[in-house]
Amino acid sequence: MVRTDRDRWDLATSVGATATMVAAQRALAADPQYALIDDPYAAPLVRAVDIDVYTRLVNGQIPVDVESGFDPARMPEAMACRTRFYDQFFVDATRSGISQVVILASGLDARAYRLGWPAGTVVHEVDMPQVIEFKTLTLADLGAKPTAERRTVAVDLRDDWAAVLQAAGFDKDVPSAWSAEGLLVYLPDDAQGALFDNVTALSATGSRLAFEFVPDTAVFNDERWRSHHARMSELGFEIDFNDLVYHGQRSHVIDHLARDGWQSASHTAKELHAANGLDYPDDDIAAVFADITYTSAVLGR
């Protein structure tokens, strides 16, 4: 389904289904077969959403066929690199003394439940109301307890989320740690700029920010990716990113933040694999996405 300006979704449709897909990949990375990350909540959350293909994926029921292009090791390794990047970002931020955290587009992220937050840490989770409600109720049914003070901010990021965040107790006068994981590609360019302008306006000196971006979303229309997508569709993976993302080049986000006083450090997906002791795949599909860029930044003003 092609995006519209005011489209809505839950965890089984449109952009929301990508959150379930990401959680399924985290579940694989946490599975004892790979044991690359620690996330005991990913698999039960995916099963609760009940999208057939992702339930089968976390249950090990997707047939492995070399000709299909489905490599069961690729998903957990790539997601482990991504998850470790954001996990370490929050560990470093809180060790520096930051006690206020904001997870933008939190989806099925369970960091408020699974990370060992220092005493006094407040974690704000921002996402669509139905997404927040589903995760909260599902984790409660699982008996999960937050390891920090968790505050939910149920709002569409295309609306005045900054006001809703502050109404939930966010204090813009103290440093904060922000993440925008798996978000930017689903925002129009002007909305991306507005998002970071809001983050800057709400951030005290010393605040930190982590995000990843696809330098040029034309990769989702690359012939190599389209061929791979067709093969994966036969296995039931129906999400077509080409319809869900907003196209254009996004590398300028670093310059945008620099003008506002953010000092950034970036690593490509290929570099992140190497830093985690993992080999980046050497094939056409991997080559398409080798330049996905992971960035952390500190606000100096």
From Swiss-Prot:
Q: Which PANTHER family match?
A: S-ADENOSYL-L-METHIONINE-DEPENDENT METHYLTRANSFERASE YKTD-RELATED, S-ADENOSYL-L-METHIONINE-DEPENDENT METHYLTRANSFERASES SUPERFAMILY PROTEIN
Give residues annotated as binding S-adenosyl-L-methionine.
D127, D156, L157
Q: Which Pfam families match?
A: LCM
Q: Which NCBIfam families match?
A: mthyl_TIGR00027
Presence of the UniProt keyword Hydrolase in the record: no
Positions of disulphide bridges: none
Enzyme class, top EC level, equals transferase
GO BP: methylation
Keyword list, A-Z: Methyltransferase, S-adenosyl-L-methionine, Transferase
Which EC numbers characterise this protein's activity in its record?
A: 2.1.1.-
Q: Which protein family is it in?
A: Belongs to the UPF0677 family.
- UniProt-recorded name of the protein: Putative S-adenosyl-L-methionine-dependent methyltransferase MUL_0450
Q: Which domain of life does the protein's organism represent?
A: Bacteria
**InterPro entries noted in UniProt:** Ppm1/Ppm2/Tcmp (IPR007213), SAM-dependent_MTases_sf (IPR029063), SAM_mthyl_Trfase_ML2640-like (IPR011610)
The species this protein belongs to is Mycobacterium ulcerans (strain Agy99)
Output the Gene Ontology terms for molecular function.
methyltransferase activity
